């Protein structure tokens, strides 16, 4: 049996739209084995127990590339990453499927080939790269080649995810974005993305609040998330380092100093006054990324 663990990811980190992403210690686990025949799923809803399941789609893509034909598969899923909340659940399924398929087939593909294949299936390197490699990454696609660099994050920082009880599909969140942007808005984000990386590198945490600002995606998507601005304002009052929309949302991610012991309790009290239910979850950066059979890929 192959066991794969993949972390959740939070993409964009404010100004770093479609390029920055970070892995956090919330995980999906996949247990896969080859059987005599058939396709058996465990741990997911009945509507996902078929060949359209994203994990199986990713596995088949890998098998086809390698030229391996399993006689049958049993796929067990233990999921801790909420779906359609902006925490990289799709990326986790794709990475988990491809890595487990490659392992079943004898480990034919190398790390670069696995990564390129995962981005081809999932389409979002800002989620796939940190899920695969761990830590924070800056990613681009250049002539269909996936290129990334790990971002050094100074010690002393943690995250807090505010996860609502409602979902928001990536497709819907993409649909509200403009077809074009002003030149000045592009410059606004480029500068702040550079500032974010530098601030995290050097431990200049007081600069993060400026680097979280953007003009490319968050304001457009905020209208899809009830009470986004009031929650953001409350987080800022509680001395957060920065607040941003996690991926396409609706989860709101907060950056905090590691020694901050009061934020979670205080923001939870505020969220309880709102219409929707919100889960408050403190998180750390996952530095390992995807692990297969207890070893880093």
Swiss-Prot record:
UniProt keyword annotations, A-Z: Amino-acid biosynthesis, ATP-binding, Cytoplasm, Kinase, Nucleotide-binding, Threonine biosynthesis, Transferase
Q: Does the keyword Cytoplasm apply?
A: yes
Query: Which reaction equations make up its catalytic activity?
Result: L-homoserine + ATP = O-phospho-L-homoserine + ADP + H(+)
- Cited InterPro entries: GHMP_kinase_C_dom, GHMP_kinase_C_sf, GHMP_kinase_N_dom, GHMP_knse_ATP-bd_CS, Homoserine_kinase, Ribosomal_Su5_D2-typ_SF, Ribsml_uS5_D2-typ_fold_subgr
Any single biological process term in GO: threonine biosynthetic process
Q: Which residues bind ATP?
A: 82-92
Any idea of its EC number? Answer: 2.7.1.39
Q: Name one GO molecular function term.
A: ATP binding
From what superkingdom does this record's organism come? Bacteria
Subcellular locations according to the entry: Cytoplasm
Pathways per UniProt: Amino-acid biosynthesis; L-threonine biosynthesis; L-threonine from L-aspartate: step 4/5
SUPFAM superfamilies associated with the record: GHMP Kinase, C-terminal domain, Ribosomal protein S5 domain 2-like
Top-level EC class: transferase
Q: Name one GO cellular component term.
A: cytoplasm
The family database entries (PANTHER family) matched by this protein are listed as: HOMOSERINE KINASE, HOMOSERINE/4-DIPHOSPHOCYTIDYL-2-C-METHYL-D-ERYTHRITOL KINASE
Entry similarity comment: Belongs to the GHMP kinase family. Homoserine kinase subfamily.
Please give the function described in this protein's UniProt entry.
Answer: Catalyzes the ATP-dependent phosphorylation of L-homoserine to L-homoserine phosphate.
NCBIfam families in the cross-refs: PRK01212.1-4, thrB
Q: What is this protein called?
A: Homoserine kinase
């Amino acid at each position: 049996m192959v066991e794969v663990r993949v972390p959740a990811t939070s993409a964009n980190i404010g100004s770093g739209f479609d390029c920055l992403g970070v892995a956090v210690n919330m995980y999906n686990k996949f247990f896969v084995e080859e059987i005599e025949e058939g396709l058996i799923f465990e741990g997911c809803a009945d509507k996902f127990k078929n060949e359209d399941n994203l994990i199986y789609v990713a596995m088949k893509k890998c098998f086809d590339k390698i030229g391996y034909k399993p006689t049958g598969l049993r796929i067990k899923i233990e999921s801790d990453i909420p779906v359609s909340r902006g925490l990289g659940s799709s990326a986790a399924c794709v990475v988990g499927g491809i890595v487990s398929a490659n392992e079943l087939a004898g480990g034919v593909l190398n790390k670069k080939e696995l990564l390129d294949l995962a981005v081809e299936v999932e389409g979002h390197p800002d989620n796939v790269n940190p899920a695969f490699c761990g830590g924070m990454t800056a990613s681009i696609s250049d002539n269909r080649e996936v290129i990334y660099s790990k971002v050094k994050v100074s010690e002393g920082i943690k995250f807090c995810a505010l996860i609502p009880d409602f979902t928001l599909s990536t497709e819907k969140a993409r649909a509200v974005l403009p077809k074009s942007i002003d030149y000045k808005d592009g410059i606004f984000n480029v500068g702040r993305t550079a500032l974010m990386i530098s601030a995290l590198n050097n431990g200049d945490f007081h600069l993060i609040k400026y680097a979280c600002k953007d003009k490319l995606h968050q304001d457009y998507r905020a209208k899809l998330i009830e009470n986004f601005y009031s929650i953001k304002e409350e987080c800022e009052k509680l001395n957060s380092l920065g607040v941003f929309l996690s991926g396409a949302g609706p989860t709101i991610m907060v950056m905090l100093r590691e020694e901050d012991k009061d934020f979670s309790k205080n923001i939870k009290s505020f969220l309880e006054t709102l219409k929707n239910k919100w889960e408050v979850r403190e998180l750390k950066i996952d530095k390992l990324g995807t692990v297969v059979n207890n070893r880093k890929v």
